[in-house]
């Protein structure tokens, strides 16, 4: 089944121009992280972040996230790029930010991390399945532990919690409402609904 992407039409000095909705939003410096985070989706997000930095390194970028998480290494590629580029990256949770999605949400610029009122956030330790010879399993287990320590470190840095507290909270799936994510320090503001007029 193919994914339908809406198109918008704008009037320009040279007539009409049509854009897929995501390209049109990119013109307004809005990027979406939607669905599972994998190498392909991470490459697209990183490319958009770098493009917008090259276009204007002093103007904020908005990263809207609705993700159940996914590949830790792919998510960390996005996270590291967010930290590396000059523009502030404001993060907005809509729907859910789970696992690596929560790491990205917390990694937004300070005082520019948001969640919509009905959204949820979930943190947990990285997981992975391994198979093979004992020595290979040991190598992969060490890497999973390294990635766990790294995500704990990033959550601690971005929330103000201690690494010990974050590690304890990540032992199992730890779900939070938008208000609870605010109290935890993952976001800075629960967004109110826009008023008419």
From Swiss-Prot:
This protein's GO cellular component annotations are: cytoplasm; endopeptidase Clp complex
In terms of InterPro entries, this protein maps to: ClpP, ClpP/crotonase-like_dom_sf, ClpP/TepA, ClpP_His_AS
Provide the alphabetized UniProt keywords: Cytoplasm, Hydrolase, Protease, Serine protease
Its UniProt entry gives the catalysed reaction(s) as:
Hydrolysis of proteins to small peptides in the presence of ATP and magnesium. alpha-casein is the usual test substrate. In the absence of ATP, only oligopeptides shorter than five residues are hydrolyzed (such as succinyl-Leu-Tyr-|-NHMec, and Leu-Tyr-Leu-|-Tyr-Trp, in which cleavage of the -Tyr-|-Leu- and -Tyr-|-Trp bonds also occurs)
Gene Ontology molecular function: any one: ATPase binding
Coarse class of the primary localization is cytoplasm
Instruction: Identify the Gene3D superfamilies for this entry.
Output: 2-enoyl-CoA Hydratase, Chain A, domain 1
Q: What are its E.C. numbers?
A: 3.4.21.92
| Oligomeric form and interacting partners | Fourteen ClpP subunits assemble into 2 heptameric rings which stack back to back to give a disk-like structure with a central cavity, resembling the structure of eukaryotic proteasomes.
This chain's protein is named ATP-dependent Clp protease proteolytic subunit 1
A single Gene Ontology biological process assigned to it is:
protein quality control for misfolded or incompletely synthesized proteins
**EC top class, in one word?**
hydrolase
Q: Which organism is it from?
A: Treponema denticola (strain ATCC 35405 / DSM 14222 / CIP 103919 / JCM 8153 / KCTC 15104)
Disulfide bond among keywords: no
**Which parts pass through the membrane?**
none
Tell me which NCBIfam families the record gives: clpP (TIGR00493), PRK00277.1 (NF001368), PRK12553.1 (NF009205)
Protein's job: Cleaves peptides in various proteins in a process that requires ATP hydrolysis. Has a chymotrypsin-like activity. Plays a major role in the degradation of misfolded proteins.
- The record's active-site residues are 99, 124
Protein localization: Cytoplasm
Belongs to which family?
Belongs to the peptidase S14 family.
């Amino acid at each position: 089944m193919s994914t339908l992407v809406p198109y918008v039409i704008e009037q320009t000095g040279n007539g009409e121009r049509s854009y897929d909705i995501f390209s049109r939003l990119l013109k307004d410096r809005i990027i979406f992280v939607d669905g599972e985070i994998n190498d392909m989706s991470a490459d697209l997000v990183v490319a958009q972040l770098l493009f917008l930095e090259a276009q204007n390194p002093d103007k904020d970028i908005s990263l809207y996230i609705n993700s159940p998480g996914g590949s830790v290494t792919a998510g960390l590629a996005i996270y590291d790029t967010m930290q590396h580029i000059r523009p502030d990256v404001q993060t907005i949770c809509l729907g859910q930010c789970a696992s690596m999605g929560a790491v990205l949400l917390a990694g937004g610029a300070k005082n520019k991390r948001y969640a919509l009122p009905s959204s949820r956030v979930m943190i947990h330790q990285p997981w992975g399945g391994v198979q093979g010879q004992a020595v290979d399993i040991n190598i992969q287990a060490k890497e999973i532990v390294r990635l766990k320590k790294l995500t704990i470190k990033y959550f601690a840095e971005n929330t103000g919690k201690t690494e010990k507290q974050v590690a304890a909270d990540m032992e199992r799936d730890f779900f939070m409402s938008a208000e609870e994510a605010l109290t935890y320090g993952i976001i800075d503001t629960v967004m109110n609904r826009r008023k008419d007029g």
